Every structure is written in structure tokens, then in C-alpha cells.
């Protein structure tokens, strides 16, 4: 019996296992079989404590502290430590840190991620060495617009970071020595060296010692005639002979001695030559391509590639006129000078310095060095009389990082890292990162494009616009004599901008070649007069002849003190005014040293990507298409060349273009005045442009660009595809008292006000004869604000989830919410401690501030969910996980075994719905089936949704979901519980049969087979055993019967034998008797008959004996009948 049970178990067990396995497969097929979290390292430990953000820092040249990161796990990249950059989540937890000083760690991270998310080294040669990064500092970062897991980091030499200078209030006395140079020998003054500096300086502290070639003896070339101011002859006055720059004849104003010689360009360059920068990696900036993969917890980022940026990349694309040597041997175009005793402006808009030059007209073929952009007038851009890209300008141009699909751009910085207003950006660097392979990281190629060629399409149709009669001097000629340099505030190209890049900046202008810092010229009516027309003025400069000007051939002093001077006092040719088409302007006779106005425009990314690597005169037409539209640019107001003559500081209270266009706007509408009113009049540098952002206006339903200009926030509407949208700037002023105030004062001829360009004295050294080539900055009675107002203290500008613009200074912050195009709701936020940095995160209506002396950050957030007011949280962030849970709660997807199979019986189209914002989400009735969520305690009714971020529309077999909650009007991703990482979840196996169908379909056949086998084995085996036993029983019975039969036969034989003997003896008598009685024969005795043995009954057990047959009785003898 035991053997039988064992055999049954062996037979049934494999079949049962097969059945159970099939049943398990059927059940698991209705569950998610691909639960793949995206950008997730894994669950954090349950202590709820994470790595905190280190002390944040800021790089002023690009006004960069942090980059808001989009994607599944949003957050920010933040400049930390002294050289590093850290990746944080939305709540201040550090995920990874890139430290260029830790080259051992970076060496192990060079490579790429394979399909299994493993960091793999390249199998071939790597063309870079991360040890070259040890001498560099991370100063900026950007996220690739096409690949959210790719970041590009900008690193510059440590030497440049160490040179960053503390900003100063823009007051004259802060920059230059108060003592005026002694009067006397003009040539001696022209070559004087400032105390401790060894160089002359510009108004911004940028002037270097004039080239040695300029120290030749004073003389006139060829004719050799004297051109003295008091003995000028008609012949000399009309001579086309260029004079030596550093001669007695050269009366161009000379710069005053710098207060701090370290601010001169020569000191900043510090012997770092153009050639050395191009050959030494430690002096070059570098762009590092970093690939983030948060599947890999050990190596969450990989260094995939690097590209060094050389100044030669830009200089190689300078137009040919920029690199030609001097044609006249003088490196200037000054012919002679006119003298006037009254440099002050007068009512008829004449404006004259004590001395002003006549210049040789610049032709389209004139070498740039022989125009006013010469080594003498722009020494900050020359080295050994060659127009190159010196150290100060090179470092300034390393900023404005932007990347899309492997094409990385540097649009430049604003130059505020040094106190030298000539530190500006001259062009755009473009670096192409090719796709990597398993063998190598791919090639890189860097080229530079000067703004002089990228902005050459600037045009202006005055008749169509009906604006100014004298458009601004931004026009370009075919010889490219206008050299625009920009203080770049930043660029923005959101995904909704159709590939256009918005550029916010301030820009230099060309001039008509007057004084070398000439930023003003006559009114349009004066300019269009004939060059030989002269007017008579008195000793005060007032116009004497009220009728038509008198045509004479020379300036002529009169006996009554009057003097005849050229009506067109600077030149005999027009300036580079903007024309109705590109590249048809007259050449610029001069270029300003400093930025003169705001400048915004849009560039086409597709064109920038496809530009030839080399600019030539033959392919220059391609570069004129870099702008979205040559007519779509703005100076913030009308596009004319008016100039300021008032001493009044412009508080600039206008907000709209309509106000600027009104008849009462006057000089407030002038682009130069606007820039100075927003910056220098409030203590800012004119280059203090920054923080370009892109946000949406709820009321106008339009996107708008915002950026900071000194003490105000400006906006510029997005350029539409029809190219006809007005592109003017709107201004939003912050509280004026935060930037200081002035006390009105009357200025007389003996009063010297604080003027930025007042550092330039006339050649005589006469203090009253100085050349005022710029706007008044502020009066000496300026009172700074106690709140902090300089650009150094400005920490950032950002748009948030609720479309707010945040601005903050050292002890005060603003949350500025645009209600429409003209109105802001301004909330001031007081801070008890000074802010050293601000970290912006785009996904929350809050930001982090680094308070002075603190080791971690504080949050500035809404007072309550129902309030729009922001306030500083007095407590430092010590637990980012708790901070997160208090805002958005926490959640996790339910385990696959706990998701009901009924969820997967649906079709994907039946469980997905579309919300009002156009996003596809999981129907709310299914959320609890697959996701478990714990809301924040103070907001239990927070709205939760599962966003569909991917699904198969063709096969309808998978869906990927991301949990989000509604915070401050925007949906924010919810991280996994007890983790700092956000993850999405992928589900497959939809449109499944009901849960019972497949198991039953599989189980029934298996059960039938098992039953059949069980029955067959349970019945067949015993029947076989019984049959065998029956056979054995029959055999035994038969054998016994045979034995019995034999025995009976023997008995009968014996009886027969006995009977036969007896009968034989009696036979005669018997026979006779029988014969007598013939009527009846004697009966034959019956044979003894044994009973047939009964058939054997069913044995109760094998081997039972059959019942023995009854013994037969002996037959009775037959009686004899007589």
C-alpha cells in the first residue's frame, strides 16, 4: 500500500508544479512587469537626513549663482565652495558635486553610460586630461535644451577669479585722483604715468601706456606745416595730413590718474599675453560636458568631453580691416584741432570741448587701426599694435552659456568682474560637441563670431516708423568699421520660442569721429549742412549770426572776440547711422569706449548653427541672417541720437513706451539718458545688466522677457514670427529710496560735479577745459541707501511657478508679480542679515538665500498657501526631506503584488483623461489602486495627479506615470517616500482578460488530466492486482479439484473393483434370475456424484484458501429382487 501512495505522489507532483507555474505567469501577466524608475538612485535611508547645500557663491561677470534644472528630478546646479558646483534637488539636498580640484575623483568618471547604466571608460584614446581642470573654477552652467540629462559647465582660470574686484559706487571720486595734473608742457602730460600704475587710464580705468611708436617728434607728415591753434592758416586747416598722436599738435583730452592702478587694463592683464593664452591650457577657459545618470548611485555623473576656448578662435574671424596694419604709419586719422574756450553746451544744442579734432574721413577700405579705433584710443584691445583679444576682454567674453543638441554658445558677460568700463564682450563663441562612440568622446570644434558681423543686419526704416530723424549709430558698413562691444546680461531661448534666442544687453555706439570718447554729436539739422559752412559764435559759444551760416574757408577769430567755426564741428562726413538695409551705412569714424544704451534683439539659432566656420568678405551675406529680423531691435526707446545737456539727475519714473513717446518726455526718451538714469544715477555701473528670464503674463496671455538694469526691471515682448510686433522695452522701477537720493545743487562754472568721463582733461591741464564726454553720474551730495544698492549686492532675478519676478539686495528683497504689461505688485522682504547669494528654483514659489555667516541656506517662501506675500524663514534648512514633506507631502507607487489585477483589465485609453492645461493624466478613480500618498499636514486637500509622461499609442501596451501635486498654481513632482529622488513608473500588460479566465483556462485541463491519471492509477492498479489473485486462486482451485478428482476416482475404482469381484462370484444365479424375470431389468446403480465445488468468493486478502468440497457419501448397495 505504501508503495502505491509513493507512486501516485511522484506522478502527480510535476503536473501540479506545471499548473501552479502557469497560474503564476497568468496572474503576474496582469501586473506591471516593467517598474522602471527614471532618474532614481534608490531609496534613501529612513533617518530623513541628507547632505546639505554648502555655502553658495556668485560670479559677477555673468551674474551666476545657480541654474534651475528641469526634468523628472528638478532642482538646481549651484556654485559652491571655492571652485565647485553642486547638483541639488528642490529642497536643498546635494545629489552630487563636481570639484575640479579633485582630479582623482574626476579621472574615474571619464566615460559614458552603457545600456545598463554602468559607467564605462572609452576603449580608445581620450583627447583630454581632467588634470588640466585643477587650475580652474566653475563659474557657470547650462542644461542642454534637448537632453535634460546633459549639462555643460564653464570653467575659467583660477587667476581670473582671484582678480574679481569689489564693485564701487559710481562716483567720480571713487575712480580718479582728485588732484588735477599740473599745467605746463602738454606733451609731458600726454605721456605722464599715474601713481603706482605705470599707465595712463581711460575713464573706466582701462587706458594703457600709448604705443611706443606714438612718441615720435611732433611734426606734420609730407607738407610739414604747423597747425597751431592760434596761427592756423587756411591751407593748414584743410590739409589732409595726419599728425602724430603724441605731439604738441594733439589736443585730444588725456586721462586723469586712476585712484586704484589695479583697475587699469595693463594691471589686470598682468603680463598674460595673447600668445601665451592661446598656448597654455592653464590660462584658457574650458567647457566640460557632463552626463547625469541617477540610476547609478556610485557614479551619478560622467565627464564625457571637454573643449578649451582660445581667444584665437574669435580673432581668426575678425574682418580683414580689423587686422590690417596702418596705412599712414600714424595709427590715427587726426588731421588738426579746433580750439574753443567754452566747452559747455548751449541752448542751440551745440556741444564743444576746448579742443576738438578734424579727422580724415574713414573709407570702407581704411584699416581699422587708422580710424578712431586705434591703439591710442582703445589700448584695452591692442597688443603690440595688433587688434587682438587681451586677457581682460577674453575673460569677460567667457559667459552667457547656452546649449542645445550639442551646440554650445558663449554670448559673453557684462564685464563687471573688474572696475573697468572697457571690459566688454566682443562676440559669440560656438563649440560643437560631436556624438561620442564607445571608443572616443567625439571631436569638438570652437569658432568665434564678432558681434560686428552678427549684428550687421541692423536696419531702420525711418519713414515707416515715423520716429527720429537721426537714427542711432549702430549701422555697419561693408568695411566693418563699427566695432560693437556688449555688456551681455544674458540670453534666453525657451522651448516655446521657436528656436529664437533673446539677447539682453547694453551696447557701444559708433561716432562721427569727434573726440576719441565722443558719444554726442549735433542735431540732425546740423549734420545735414554742407561741410564748408561756418557760423560765428562769441566767447561763450553762443551763436551770433541769426541768419544763414556764412560760407568761409577757415575758422577765423574776430577782433570782437567772436570766432567763425565749422557748423559741422567734428567732421566733414556723416556718421554710421542705421540705414534702411544692412551693410550700407557710412563707416564709423569712431567707436565709444563704453556702452551707451540698452540693446535687445533676437537671433536665429538655426542660422547660428549653420554659419560657416570662417568669415570672409565673400560669404558675409550669410552672417547678415543671424538676426531674426534686422528691424527687430530696441534701445528701450526711440532709435535716435539725441544727447543730454542737463545737470539734473534723471529719476526716470516712466514705465511705458507711451509715456516715453509723449511730447513732455523730452530727453528722458533718449536711449543714453535712460541707461544712465537706471544705472549710474543710482550708483550702478552702466554694465550692470543681468538675469535674463522668460515668463508668462496671465493677463495678456503672452510671454515676455525680463532682465535687470541697475535699479529697475525691464521687459521686452517676444518677437513674433510676422516680424512686425513692436519691440520696445517697458520699465518697472523698484523703490527709489533703496538706491540713494540726491540733494539739489546749483552748478556754476567753478563747480566740478561727479561725472564719470570727467576724468578727461584737456591737453592744457586746465580744469575748466576738461572734456565731458558722458552723462552726469550723480552730484557729490549723493546719499547712499542703508539697504544696499550696488550691483555687488544684487543676488538674482527669477521667475517662479506663479509667474513672479524675484529681486533681492543685501538686506532687502522684492517679489514682483506682473499683473499686466504696465503694473507690478511689489512686496518688499526685509532681511536681518546680509545675503551673500540666492539660489533660484523654478518649480517652487520660493527661493533659497545664503545669509552672511551661515553654513546653510534659508528659505524665502509664501507666508501661507492663501497669501501672495513672501517672507524669510528664520530657521536654516537642516532637513531637506522634512522641508519637502511639509510642502508637497510624500508618496510611493504600490508594490506590483498589491495592485489589483482589475486595473490592468482596462484599456489605456479608458483610464487616461485630459485636464484643462492640456496634459494627459490618469483618471483620478484609479490613483489609489497604484499609488499611495501622504499629503502635508497643513494642506491635506492638496491636489494630486499622475501625469502621463509617455505611453504607446500604436500598440497601447504601456504607460509611464509621474506623481505631481498642485503647489502655488503649478504642478510639482512628488519624490518617493524617504528618498530625495523623484521617479516615474512604467506599467505594461493592459487590456488583459478578467483575472479568472486565464487561470481557469490553464487549470481545468491540468485538473482533468490529473484526475484521469489519478483514477487510472487508483482503479487500474487494484484491478490488475485482483486479476492476478483470481488467476492464482483459480489455479489453486483447479489443482485441488484435480487432486480431489483423482482421490474420488480412486475411491470409485476401488468400489468398482470390489463390486466386480463379488458380482463375478454370483453371476450365474443372478443371470438366471434375470432371465426369468425378463419383464424388468435390474436398475443400474447410480454412480457416486460428488457435488460441484462452489466458486471461490472474493478473497478478503490475497492467498485465502478456497472452501474444500464436501466428501461424497458411499452409494448404498442395490437390493437383490427375487
UniProtKB/Swiss-Prot annotation:
Chain intervals with Gly residues compositional bias: 195-208
Compartments in which it is found: Cell membrane
CC terms in the record's Gene Ontology section: plasma membrane
Sequence intervals crossing the membrane: 1001-1021
Residue stretches of biased makeup (Low complexity): 1079-1122
Region listing for Disordered, in residue ranges: 182-208, 244-273, 541-562, 1066-1122
InterPro entries recorded: Adhesin_P1, P1_N
Signal sequence extent: 1-26
The keyword Phosphoprotein is annotated on this UniProt entry: no
UniProt keyword list: Cell membrane, Cytadherence, Membrane, Signal, Transmembrane, Transmembrane helix
Bias-annotated ranges (Polar residues): 259-273
A single BP term in Gene Ontology: adhesion of symbiont to microvasculature
Highest taxon of the lineage: Bacteria
Pfam families linked: P1_N
Membrane topology: Single-pass type I membrane protein
Role: Could be involved in cytadherence.
Family of the protein in this entry: Belongs to the adhesin P1 family.
Protein's UniProt name: Adhesin P1
Gene (UniProt): gapA
Amino acid at each position: 500500500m505504501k508503495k502505491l501512495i509513493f507512486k501516485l505522489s511522484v506522478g502527480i507532483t510535476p503536473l501540479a508544479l506545471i499548473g501552479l507555474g502557469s497560474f503564476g505567469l497568468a496572474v503576474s501577466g496582469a501586473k506591471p512587469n516593467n517598474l522602471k524608475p527614471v532618474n532614481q538612485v534608490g531609496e534613501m535611508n529612513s533617518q530623513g537626513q541628507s547632505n546639505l547645500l554648502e555655502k553658495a557663491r556668485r560670479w559677477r561677470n555673468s551674474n551666476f549663482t545657480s541654474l534651475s534644472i528641469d526634468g523628472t528630478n528638478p532642482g538646481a546646479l549651484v556654485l559652491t565652495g571655492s571652485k565647485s558646483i553642486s547638483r541639488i534637488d528642490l529642497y536643498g539636498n546635494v545629489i552630487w558635486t563636481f570639484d575640479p580640484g579633485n582630479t582623482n575623483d574626476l579621472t574615474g568618471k571619464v566615460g559614458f553610460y552603457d545600456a545598463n547604466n554602468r559607467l564605462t571608460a572609452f576603449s580608445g584614446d581620450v583627447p583630454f586630461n581632467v588634470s588640466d581642470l585643477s587650475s580652474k573654477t566653475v563659474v557657470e552652467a547650462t542644461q542642454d535644451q534637448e537632453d535634460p540629462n546633459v549639462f555643460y559647465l564653464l570653467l575659467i582660470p583660477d587667476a581670473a577669479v582671484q582678480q574679481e574686484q569689489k564693485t564701487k559706487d559710481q562716483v567720480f571720486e571713487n575712480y580718479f585722483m582728485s588732484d588735477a595734473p599740473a599745467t605746463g608742457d602738454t606733451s609731458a602730460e600726454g605721456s605722464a604715468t599715474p601713481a603706482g600704475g605705470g599707465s595712463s587710464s581711460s575713464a573706466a580705468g582701462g587706458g594703457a601706456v600709448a604705443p611706443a611708436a606714438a612718441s615720435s617728434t611732433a611734426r606734420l607728415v609730407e607738407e610739414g606745416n604747423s597747425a597751431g591753434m592760434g596761427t592756423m592758416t587756411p591751407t593748414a586747416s584743410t590739409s589732409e595730413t595726419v599728425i602724430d598722436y603724441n605731439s604738441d599738435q594733439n589736443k585730444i583730452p588725456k586721462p586723469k590718474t586712476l585712484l586704484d592702478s589695479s583697475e587699469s587694463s595693463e594691471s589686470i592683464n598682468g603680463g598674460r599675453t595673447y600668445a601665451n593664452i592661446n598656448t597654455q591650457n592653464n590660462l584658457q577657459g574650458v567647457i566640460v560636458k557632463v552626463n547625469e545618470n541617477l540610476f547609478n548611485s556610485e557614479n551619478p555623473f560622467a565627464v564625457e568631453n571637454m573643449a578649451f576656448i582660445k581667444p584665437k578662435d574669435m580673432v581668426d574671424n575678425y574682418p580683414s580691416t580689423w587686422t590690417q596694419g596702418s596705412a599712414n604709419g600714424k595709427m590715427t586719422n587726426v588731421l588738426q584741432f579746433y580750439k574753443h574756450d567754452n566747452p559747455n553746451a548751449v541752448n542751440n544744442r551745440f556741444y564743444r570741448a576746448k579742443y576738438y579734432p578734424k579727422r580724415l574721413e574713414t573709407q570702407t577700405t581704411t584699416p581699422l587701426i587708422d580710424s578712431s579705433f586705434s591703439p591710442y584710443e582703445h589700448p584695452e584691445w591692442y597688443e603690440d599694435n595688433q587688434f587682438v583679444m587681451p586677457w581682460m576682454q577674453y575673460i569677460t567674453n567667457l559667459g552667457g552659456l547656452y546649449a542645445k543638441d550639442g551646440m554650445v554658445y558663449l554670448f559673453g558677460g557684462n564685464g563687471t568682474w573688474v572696475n573697468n568700463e572697457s571690459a566688454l564682450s566682443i562676440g559669440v563663441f560656438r563649440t560643437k560637441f560631436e556624438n561620442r562612440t564607445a571608443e572616443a568622446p567625439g571631436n569638438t570644434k570652437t569658432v568665434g563670431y564678432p558681434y560686428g558681423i552678427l549684428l550687421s543686419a541692423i536696419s531702420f526704416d525711418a519713414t515707416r516708423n515715423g520716429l527720429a530723424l537721426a537714427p542711432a549709430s549702430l549701422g555697419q558698413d561693408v568695411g566693418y568699421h563699427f566695432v560693437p562691444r556688449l555688456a551681455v546680461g544674458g540670453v534666453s531661448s525657451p522651448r516655446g520660442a521657436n528656436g529664437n534666442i533673446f539677447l539682453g544687453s547694453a551696447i557701444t555706439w559708433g561716432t562721427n569721429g569727434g573726440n576719441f570718447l565722443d558719444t554726442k554729436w549735433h542735431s540732425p539739422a546740423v549734420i545735414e549742412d554742407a561741410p564748408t559752412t561756418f557760423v560765428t559764435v562769441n566767447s561763450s559759444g553762443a551763436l551770433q549770426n541769426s541768419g544763414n551760416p556764412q560760407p568761409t574757408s577757415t575758422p577765423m577769430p574776430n577782433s570782437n572776440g567772436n570766432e567763425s567755426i565749422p557748423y559741422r564741428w567734428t567732421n566733414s562726413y556723416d556718421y554710421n547711422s542705421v540705414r534702411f538695409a544692412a551693410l550700407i551705412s557710412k563707416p564709423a569714424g569712431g567707436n565709444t569706449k563704453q556702452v551707451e544704451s540698452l540693446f535687445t534683439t533676437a537671433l536665429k539659432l538655426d542660422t547660428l548653427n549653420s554659419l560657416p566656420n570662417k568669415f570672409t568678405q565673400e560669404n558675409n551675406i550669410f552672417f547678415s541672417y543671424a538676426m531674426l529680423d534686422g528691424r527687430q531691435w530696441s534701445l528701450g526707446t526711440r532709435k535716435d541720437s539725441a544727447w543730454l545737456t542737463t545737470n539734473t539727475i534723471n529719476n526716470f519714473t516712466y514705465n511705458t513706451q507711451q509715456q516715453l513717446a509723449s511730447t513732455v518726455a523730452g530727453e528722458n526718451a533718449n536711449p543714453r539718458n535712460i541707461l544712465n538714469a537706471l544705472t549710474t544715477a543710482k550708483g550702478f555701473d552702466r554694465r550692470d545688466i543681468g538675469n535674463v528670464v522668460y515668463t508668462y503674463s496671465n493677463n495678456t496671455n503672452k510671454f515676455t522677457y525680463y532682465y535687470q538694469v541697475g535699479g529697475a526691471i525691464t521687459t521686452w515682448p517676444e518677437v513674433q514670427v510676422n516680424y512686425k510686433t513692436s519691440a520696445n522695452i517697458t520699465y518697472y522701477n523698484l523703490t527709489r529710496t533703496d538706491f540713494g537720493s540726491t540733494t539739489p545743487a546749483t552748478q556754476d562754472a567753478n563747480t566740478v560735479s561727479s561725472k564719470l568721463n570727467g576724468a578727461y582733461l584737456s591737453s592744457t591741464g586746465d580744469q575748466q577745459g576738461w572734456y565731458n564726454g558722458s552723462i552726469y553720474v550723480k552730484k557729490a551730495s549723493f546719499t547712499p541707501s542703508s539697504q544696499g544698492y550696488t550691483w555687488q549686492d544684487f543676488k538674482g532675478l527669477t521667475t517662479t511657478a506663479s509667474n513672479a519676478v524675484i529681486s533681492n539686495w543685501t538686506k532687502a528683497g522684492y517679489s514682483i508679480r506682473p499683473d499686466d504689461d504696465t503694473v507690478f505688485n511689489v512686496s518688499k522682504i526685509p532681511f536681518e542679515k546680509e545675503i551673500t547669494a540666492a539660489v533660484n528654483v523654478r518649480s517652487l514659489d520660493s527661493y533659497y538665500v545664503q545669509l552672511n555667516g551661515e553654513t546653510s541656506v534659508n528659505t524665502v517662501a509664501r507666508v501661507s498657501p492663501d497669501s501672495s506675500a513672501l517672507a524669510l524663514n528664520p530657521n536654516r534648512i537642516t532637513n531637506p526631506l522634512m522641508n519637502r514633506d511639509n510642502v508637497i507631502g510624500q508618496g510611493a507607487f504600490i508594490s506590483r503584488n498589491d495592485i489589483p489585477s482589475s486595473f490592468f483589465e482596462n484599456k489605456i485609453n479608458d483610464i487616461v483623461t485630459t485636464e484643462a492645461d492640456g496634459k494627459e493624466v490618469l483618471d483620478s478613480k484609479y490613483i489609489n489602486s497604484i499609488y499611495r500618498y501622504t499629503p502635508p499636514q497643513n494642506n491635506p486637500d492638496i491636489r494630486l495627479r499622475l501625469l502621463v509622461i509617455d505611453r504607446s499609442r500604436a500598440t497601447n501596451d504601456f504607460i509611464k506615470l509621474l506623481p505631481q501635486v498642485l503647489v502655488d498654481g503649478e504642478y510639482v513632482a512628488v519624490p518617493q517616500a524617504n528618498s530625495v529622488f523623484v521617479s516615474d513608473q512604467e506599467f505594461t500588460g493592459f487590456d488583459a482578460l478578467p483575472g479568472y479566465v486565464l487561470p481557469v483556462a490553464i487549470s481545468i485541463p491540468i485538473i482533468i488530466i490529473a484526475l484521469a491519471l489519478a483514477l487510472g492509477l487508483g482503479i487500474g492498479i487494484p484491478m490488475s492486482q485482483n486479476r492476478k489473485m483470481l488467476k492464482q486462486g483459480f489455479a489453486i482451485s483447479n489443482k485441488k479439484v484435480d487432486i480431489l478428482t483423482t482421490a474420488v476416482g480412486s475411491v470409485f475404482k476401488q468400489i468398482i473393483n470390489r463390486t466386480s469381484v463379488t458380482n463375478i462370484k454370483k453371476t450365474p444365479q443372478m443371470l438366471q434370475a434375470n432371465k426369468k424375470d425378463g419383464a424388468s431389468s435390474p436398475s443400474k446403480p447410480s454412480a457416486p456424484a460428488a457435488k460441484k465445488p462452489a466458486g471461490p468468493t472474493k478473497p478478503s486478502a490475497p492467498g485465502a484458501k478456497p472452501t474444500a468440497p464436501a466428501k461424497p457419501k458411499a452409494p448404498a448397495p442395490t437390493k437383490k429382487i427375487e
